[in-house]
């Protein structure tokens, strides 16, 4: 069997580096791209370049945005006194799909994981404390995953936030033990947000 030409091998190699894309799927994608109109391939390439060029972190909550302040932080109808702390931007999107939360977010960009060398200075805990010090936030909802690292991060945040006059709550049942926020269905997340509890 003849090997693929270099241009196809190169495309397969790059596609297979994406999460969840193995060699076979990368081959199928490369073959598909060879058969779609040139315009579609150029639009895909342009969208990928734009993704890298235009996506940044919101200067307030650190979720993904294409503007300095994201649409959620810039929305005057959101309750700025209610702050939901999540691990990453995908959790923001998952909670937003429920339409059950009307507050604002703080994205940590990770969880505490000593085994992986990730400590408090490696995620956006300092920025969270800075937001709380401003006195606008009255309730903090900890919506980290229920895996060991997420629970440890939530417990650490409870201690860090004790000196401040804020109510700290945790998303409630509905999230399975060891479950991840980003993979939960909207109904489960809605129930978890509505049944949060004080810590």
UniProtKB/Swiss-Prot annotation:
Alphabetized UniProt keyword annotations: DNA damage, DNA recombination, DNA repair, Metal-binding, Zinc, Zinc-finger
NAD found in the keyword field: no
Start and end residues, zinc fingers (C4-type): 58-73
Source domain of life: Bacteria
InterPro entries noted in UniProt: DNA_Rcmb_RecR (IPR000093), Rcmb_RecR (IPR023627), Rcmb_RecR_Znf (IPR015967), TOPRIM_dom (IPR006171), TOPRIM_RecR (IPR034137)
Residues covered by the Toprim domain: 81-176
UniProt GO molecular function: DNA binding; zinc ion binding
Biological process (GO), any one: DNA repair
SUPFAM superfamilies recorded: Recombination protein RecR
Entry similarity comment: Belongs to the RecR family.
Described function: May play a role in DNA repair. It seems to be involved in an RecBC-independent recombinational process of DNA repair. It may act with RecF and RecO.
Protein name, entry field: Recombination protein RecR
Lineage: Bacteria, Pseudomonadati, Thermodesulfobacteriota, Desulfobacteria, Desulfobacterales
Gene: recR
């Amino acid at each position: 069997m003849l090997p693929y030409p270099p241009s196809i091998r190169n495309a397969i190699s790059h596609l297979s580096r994406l999460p969840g894309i193995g060699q076979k799927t990368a081959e199928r994608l490369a073959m598909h791209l060879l058969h779609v109109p040139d315009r579609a391939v150029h639009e895909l390439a342009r969208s990928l370049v734009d993704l890298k060029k235009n996506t940044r972190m919101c200067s307030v909550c650190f979720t993904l945005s294409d503007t300095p302040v994201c649409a959620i932080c810039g929305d005057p109808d959101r309750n700025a006194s209610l702050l939901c702390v999540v691990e990453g931007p995908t959790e923001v999107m998952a909670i937003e799909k429920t339409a059950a939360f009307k507050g604002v977010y703080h994205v940590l960009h990770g969880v505490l994981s000593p085994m992986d060398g990730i400590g408090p200075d490696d995620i956006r805990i300092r920025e969270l404390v800075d937001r709380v010090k401003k006195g606008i936030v009255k309730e903090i909802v900890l919506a980290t995953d229920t895996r060991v690292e997420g629970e440890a991060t939530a417990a650490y945040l409870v201690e860090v936030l004790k000196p401040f006059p804020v109510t700290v709550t945790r998303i409630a049942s509905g999230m399975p033990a060891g479950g991840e926020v980003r993979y939960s269905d909207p109904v489960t997340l809605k129930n978890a947000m509505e049944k949060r509890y004080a810590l």
